[in-house]
Every structure is written in C-alpha cells, then in structure tokens.
Amino acid sequence: MKKLSLYISLLCLILTAGACKNKTGRPATASSELTDDALMDTVQHRTFLYFWEGAEPNSGLAPERYHVDGVYPQNDANVVTSGGSGFGIMAILAGIDRGYVTREEGLARMERIVSFLEKADRFHGAYPHWWYGDTGKVKPFGQKDNGGDLVETAFLMQGLLAVHQYYINGNE
C-alpha cells in the first residue's frame, strides 16, 4: 500500500510539474499574477456565491454536495448539511459586509433558514448531520447514525450566533 501511495504521489508530482509551464516556456511575468488582495476578493466572492446561489430553495441551507453536471445518482440534490450551513451562514455575513447583497436580503435569507430550523427534525436539541431540504426530515448519516450530531450542530450554532451578533442592533 505504501508503494502504491508513493507511485501515485510521484505521478501527481510529475504531471503537476509538466502542467506548470506556460506556452512560451518562460517564467510568468508579474503582471499575470493576482495580488494577495485580488486573490482574497475572488475567494470570498466565489465562496459567498456557492452558499448564496447554491442554497437549497426551501430551507436556504447549504447543499451537502454539488454535482457540476446536475446528475445526482442517489436522488439527493435536495439534501442539506447542518455544519456546512453554519459555515455558509458566516460566508453570507461576509458577503453582506462586502456588499454582495444588502443587509435586508441577508436578513430575509436568515429568516428563511431559522424558519426551516424551527420545524426541522432535531434530537434533544441537537440537529442531524443531514436533512432533506424540502421536508426537514433527517437523512440518516449511516445505518446506525440517524440522530443528532453534536459537532455539526456546533458548527451551525456558530453561524447562528454570528448572525445574532451581526444584527443585534437592528438592520441598519
């Protein structure tokens, strides 16, 4: 197994090294590189877009997975994740702060999320790892794991606490 891992690592290294050359064979010029600020802007905006535009329509929460081709062999396109949604909520707050959407639009999304969570399955206060976003019913994480997930609940609560602090003085 170690040899196989070594061979795969070497193959990846060789392929990566070959792919790094530009067409002229000369080093890239500084003008073709992103500045740190431009890179940060790009990462923040695209992260925001994933959670904003990619949200499950009913719940407003983050999808468990995204298939670029739109084909979901397990018919799970509407499955949402609790922990990933916590991260998504914080990304939306960053998007509001960066001006990608207004505070009002962000608040409307948060209200949709909280309304969903009020009715969604939970277990002694803990949310499951996954739900069906259209129903709020738990999607079992495994054969013997169909209840609350404390770690994922903590990630979700982090996001909701951040929302509380962000809007604590109103929507201004």
Question: Which stretches of residues belong to each language-model region?
Answer:
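Bacterial N-terminal signal peptides that target proteins for export
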Residues: 1-8
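Internal, well-ordered domain-core segments that constitute the primary functional module
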Residues: 133-172
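C-terminal motif of bacterial Sec signal peptides marking the signal peptidase cleavage site
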Residues: 16-19
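Secondary-structure capping and boundary motifs in well-ordered enzyme cores
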Residues: 36-39, 43, 77-84, 148-155
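Low-complexity, Ser/Thr/Pro/Gly-enriched N-terminal "stalk/linker" regions
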Residues: 26-77, 124
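Post-signal peptide N-terminal segment of secreted/secretory-pathway proteins
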Residues: 85-136, 163
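Well-ordered alpha-helical scaffold segments within catalytic/enzyme domains
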Residues: 29-39, 50, 86-101, 116, ...
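Carbohydrate-binding/catalytic loop surfaces
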Residues: 63-79, 126-148
